């Protein structure tokens, strides 16, 4: 069979010019459609940026820094600096554990808690906004109300909201929706992040940049201070409880609950999971 006979006997080869034209048209349409979408997305993005620029441009000379514009002063390092201080801090912090069983008595003096929060207040923050509020609760009735709110939400969290794998991962820690430590611990420290500032008359003021990161850094310093004071704590982040707890404490709308810390001395015979922390080689990369 010669080439002409092969072409005439094959429907595909016989109509190849039409097929070629059809495929070429499909390719051209796809290219135009893709290019049109790409241009449309770029245009929308540019348009959005232009709107934002115009919005800020309207402020003109009204823009003022949130901080008072003062001359810088010489840096004064902290006191009692020690070259071995980092190692001493590590030895201190390696003993820190999450404690879920607290003694109601003896109760640490409130001044100790105040000093720990003072230390937390030295944390850096975006544009020096210091976007944090520490609510220290020691009244038994108020602690019971907090526990009631948290346990109601946690029951729903464990039974409905949380993924089964999450609940399974928590099993070795022996945690559930019952939070006895909320009434056992002599102190509860509720750490709120401030998403923006408020004036004395409740008017919204400056934006608080990186408020969650800033408040989280401060919370880490607080944990170090509590450990240095010989106090035990537990970092908790109650799901879906923030608004109710904020209202209970009468906090303003610009504050959102970030962390709830039970604080006190561990109960006699208190046990913790047999866990090991990662080695330095697993958490540090040197270049």
Curated annotation (Swiss-Prot):
Gene3D superfamilies: NADH Oxidase (3.40.109.10)
Keywords: Cell membrane, Flavoprotein, FMN, Membrane, NADP, Oxidoreductase, Transmembrane, Transmembrane helix
One MF term in the entry's GO annotations: oxidoreductase activity
Residues holding 3,5-diiodo-L-tyrosine: 127, 154, 158, 179
Effect annotated for changing residue 179 to Q: Moderate decrease in catalytic activity but strongly reduces affinity for substrates I-Tyr and I2-Tyr
Main location: membrane
InterPro entries per record: Nitroreductase (IPR029479), Nitroreductase-like (IPR000415), Nitroreductase/BluB (IPR050627)
Residues that hold FMN according to the record: 96-100, 125-126, 235-237, 277
Enzyme class, first EC level, given as a word: oxidoreductase
GO cellular component, one term: plasma membrane
EC number from the UniProt entry: 1.21.1.1
Swiss-Prot/TrEMBL GO biological process terms: positive regulation of fertilization; tyrosine metabolic process
Catalytic activity: 2 iodide + L-tyrosine + 2 NADP(+) = 3,5-diiodo-L-tyrosine + 2 NADPH + H(+); iodide + L-tyrosine + NADP(+) = 3-iodo-L-tyrosine + NADPH; 3-iodo-L-tyrosine + iodide + NADP(+) = 3,5-diiodo-L-tyrosine + NADPH + H(+); L-tyrosine + chloride + NADP(+) = 3-chloro-L-tyrosine + NADPH
Topology relative to the membrane: Single-pass membrane protein
Tissue expression from the record: Expressed in spermatocytes.
Residues where 3-iodo-L-tyrosine binds: 127, 154, 158, 179
Mutant lacking the gene: phenotype: Adults produce fewer progeny. Larvae display an increase in survival when fed a diet enriched with 3-chloro-L-tyrosine (Cl-Tyr), whereas survival is unaffected when fed a diet containing 3-iodo-L-tyrosine (I-Tyr) or 3-bromo-L-tyrosine (Br-Tyr). Adult survival is unaffected when fed a diet supplemented with halotyrosines.
Family: Belongs to the nitroreductase family.
Further information: Named condet in honor of Dr. Jean Francois Condet who discovered that ingestion of iodide could reduce goiter.
Biological function: Catalyzes the dehalogenation of halotyrosines such as 3-bromo-L-tyrosine, 3-chloro-L-tyrosine, 3-iodo-L-tyrosine and 3,5-diiodo-L-tyrosine. Activity towards 3-fluoro-L-tyrosine is weak. Important for male and female fertility. May be involved in maintaining the viability of sperm, both during development in the testes and storage in the female spermatheca.
Subunit composition and interactions: Homodimer.
Protein name (record): Iodotyrosine deiodinase
Species: Drosophila melanogaster (Fruit fly)
């Amino acid at each position: 069979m010669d080439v002409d006979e092969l072409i005439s006997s094959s429907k595909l080869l016989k109509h190849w010019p039409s097929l070629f034209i059809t495929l070429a048209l499909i390719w051209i349409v796809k290219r135009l459609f893709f290019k049109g979408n790409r241009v449309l997305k770029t245009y929308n993005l540019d348009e959005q940026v232009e709107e934002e620029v115009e919005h800020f441009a309207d402020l003109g000379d009204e823009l003022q820094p949130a901080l008072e514009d003062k001359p810088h002063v010489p840096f004064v390092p902290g006191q009692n600096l020690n070259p071995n201080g980092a190692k001493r801090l590590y030895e201190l912090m390696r003993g820190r554990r999450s404690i879920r069983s607290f003694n109601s008595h003896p109760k640490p003096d409130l001044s100790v808690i105040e000093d720990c929060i003072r230390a937390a207040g030295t944390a850096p923050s975006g544009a020096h906004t210091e976007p944090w509020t520490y609510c220290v609760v020691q009244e038994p009735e108020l602690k019971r109300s907090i526990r009631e709110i948290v346990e109601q939400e946690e029951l729903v969290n464990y039974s409905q909201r949380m993924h089964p794998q999450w609940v399974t991962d928590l099993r070795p820690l022996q945690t559930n929706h019952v939070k006895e430590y909320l009434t056992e611990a002599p102190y509860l420290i509720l750490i709120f992040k401030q998403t923006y500032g408020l004036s004395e008359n409740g008017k919204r003021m400056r934006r608080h940049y990186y408020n969650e990161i800033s408040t989280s850094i401060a919370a880490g310093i607080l944990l170090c201070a509590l450990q240095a004071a010989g106090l035990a704590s537990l970092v908790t982040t109650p799901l879906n409880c923030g608004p109710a707890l904020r209202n209970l404490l009468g906090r303003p709308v610009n504050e959102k609950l970030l962390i709830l810390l039970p604080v006190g001395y561990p109960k006699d015979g208190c046990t913790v999971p047999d866990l090991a922390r990662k080695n330095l080689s697993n958490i540090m990369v040197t270049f």
